Design a protein with these regions (language model features):
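Aromatic- and carboxylate-enriched substrate-binding clefts and catalytic-loop regions
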Residues: 46, 118, 129, 279-560
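Basic, gly/Ser/Thr/Pro-rich low-complexity segments located predominantly at protein N termini
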Residues: 140, 154, 159-161, 172, ...
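Conserved catalytic/cofactor-binding microenvironments
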Residues: 563
Length: 563
């Protein structure tokens, strides 16, 4: 039933195997499965350091004692215990796991409700549940006891007003403006990482916490103890990867809109900032500057001299950032080769398309390392080597036209099983390519992330949000919870993205407030799709109205200059 193996505490009973092991400072990793073995995948965990757990097994209840004798009052049978620094875990003969701080406080306990348990209830509710198995996959549920007065922060970015997530139900899935980063910090004094990239949900209810993955092979989570929130966050980031320092240009002002549709238009905006003496550090080339999606290159009809454009911007002290989508149009020059080599996301049934936006598109499979290399080689040739060396990784969730997660498959597995990890690997393609070129601080603007994305230079923005005061308010808590979840580089579209008119006085007031807020975000970026629309540019799509700091009246301009 209990076994110590290579510093790990192993429990097995009735076809289930539970493994608890030290993983980093003051942290314990728990894996459990009803398969014959564990997958061996570490997901968000980048590295395991030299910390080893101290394992003790007590087969005789009367043998309890020592410094922690009073900590296990509910443990009246045999049990196993593992210690790593400030964190202890006990698993009893009924398979219930309880986590303790070294001072004796209970931090977290699995939720079982059976006659044999401490509460002695005939509900037969299990703390770990495996059901509806197809092959070696299950619908997985992990339950924990709710704690009165507990506050929960983190989990990524959700478009809601709640900062404290206690009482919330959160979907574990990536969507435009929703970013699932499944780490939370508890006011009780621990951190928790759900180390599973599958689609599902979590409920932080008052009568219990419940994690669900719709399709997975094993339960996998990490508990981290600490005396302060900063200590817990430090340990978490050490295990999942710390972010590179933001380059100096990134801390300045970013000018962006949907969209500068040709080279001369973009340069004229940059020149005007220079003439006005207003500092501008970054200007962004948005989507549909390309020939076709998936060809990853400028359309020479509208961008005839990219090296010359980049040189002029550099002379003005301005960096250029280029939008890249993970989409490949079925009529693009790279589609057939990528399809033949297995570099594209596959559908399980129906029409083999994943997005419809200005064409018929399929996402490239960022979980496939060869696909990542292939895409970077195109990016390097057509952008990086032309002088455009910084990137905006849009549609990074990826944004399926139909969010039918069970219908899509990556090389790494079905989207239901592994889908939330896509933005991390999408980002990794650019991080690996840029570091190979000697970039010591590779940062990419991206619309999604997962646990561990920070290591690869994720600068997340909050997606295509609405231009309203209510939506603006939601971004404040979204940014704070993203930081707690381990994504420190974060920003928004100043003014919001959808629904504003450049000539609307009400929007001018919103813009001013948002601009002031944007100044104090990690990155200050003005972006949006302003009305009325202008119907010129590439054949696939038009362009929004002006979106520069002088576009919203004299008062807004003077205030913007101040900030």
């Amino acid at each position: 039933m209990f076994l110590e193996k290579e510093g790990k505490l192993i429990y097995s009973y009735d076809g289930e195997t539970v493994c608890i092991e030290a993983w980093g400072k003051d942290a314990l990793r728990v894996r459990a499965t009803k398969n014959r073995s564990f997958t061996g995948r570490d997901w968000a965990l980048e590295a395991k350091d030299a910390h080893a757990g101290e394992v003790e097994i007590f087969e005789d209840p009367s043998a309890k004692g020592g410094a922690f004798a009073n900590m296990y009052e509910g443990t009246d049978t045999s049990y196993g215990k593992i210690t790593n620094g400030k964190l202890h875990a006990v698993i009893d003969s009924g398979s219930v796991i309880t986590f303790y701080h070294e001072d004796g406080r209970v931090l977290l306990k699995e939720h079982f409700r059976r006659l044999r348990d401490e509460e002695s209830m005939p509900l037969n509710i299990m703390g770990r549940e495996y059901s509806n198995g197809v092959g070696d996959n299950f619908r997985i549920v992990a339950r924990f006891v709710a704690r009165k007065g507990e506050k929960i922060f983190g989990m990524g970015q959700y478009q809601q007003h709640e900062l404290d997530l206690k009482g919330c139900m959160l979907e574990l899935a990536q969507r435009n403006s929703q970013v699932s980063v499944p780490f939370y910090l508890s006011s009780i004094g621990y951190g928790f990482l759900w180390n599973n990239p599958g689609v599902g949900q979590v409920m932080f209810a008052n009568n219990g916490t419940e994690w669900v993955t719709e399709s997975g092979k094993e339960i996998d989570y990490l508990v981290i103890a600490g005396d302060t929130p900063a200590e817990i966050e430090e340990n978490y980031m050490t295990l999942t990867g710390k972010p590179p320092m933001m380059p100096e240009y990134g801390m300045g002002f970013w000018q962006c809109k949907l969209r500068y549709w040709n080279q001369e238009q973009l340069l004229s905006v940059a020149r005007k900032y220079k003439e006005l003496g207003v500092p501008l550090d970054v200007i962004v080339v948005d989507f549909f500057h390309w020939t076709k999606q998936g060809e990853f290159k400028f359309d020479p009809k509208y961008w005839p001299d990219v090296p010359g454009m980049c040189r002029e911007l550099k002379e003005m002290g301005i960096q250029v950032v280029v939008s890249v989508w993970p989409t490949v149009d079925i009529y693009s020059e790279n589609f057939e080769e990528m399809k033949e080599k297995g570099y594209l996301v596959r559908t399980e049934h129906g029409v083999p398309l994943t997005m419809l936006c200005g064409g018929n598109e399929v996402f490239f499979d960022a979980t496939n390392p060869d696909a990542r290399t292939y895409v970077w080689e195109k990016i390097k040739k057509n952008y990086y080597d032309q002088g455009a060396k910084l990137f905006w990784l849009d549609v990074a969730e990826p944004e399926y036209s139909v969010y039918d997660f069970k219908n899509y498959r990556y090389q790494l597995g079905s989207v239901q099983e592994v889908g939330n990890i896509y933005p991390k690997y999408y980002l990794k393609a650019f991080y690996d390519g840029m570091t190979a070129e000697g970039d010591a601080m590779p940062i990419s603007l991206i619309r999604s992330a997962w646990a561990g994305s920070a290591k690869y230079g994720a600068l997340v923005w909050s997606g295509d949000i609405v231009s309203s005061f209510e939506c603006f308010q939601r971004q404040v808590q979204a940014g704070l919870n993203m930081a707690v979840a381990g994504i420190p580089w974060w920003t928004t579209d100043i003014g919001g993205f959808h629904g504003a008119r450049t000539d609307d006085p009400d929007f001018h007031r919103l813009y001013i407030r948002w601009f002031e807020y944007g100044c104090f975000c990690p990155v200050m970026r003005l972006h949006g799709n302003r009305n009325p629309q202008e119907g010129y540019g590439a054949e696939q799509i038009g362009s929004g109205s002006d979106n520069e700091i002088w576009s919203f009246g004299d008062e807004a301009y003077e205030i913007s200059k101040k900030y």
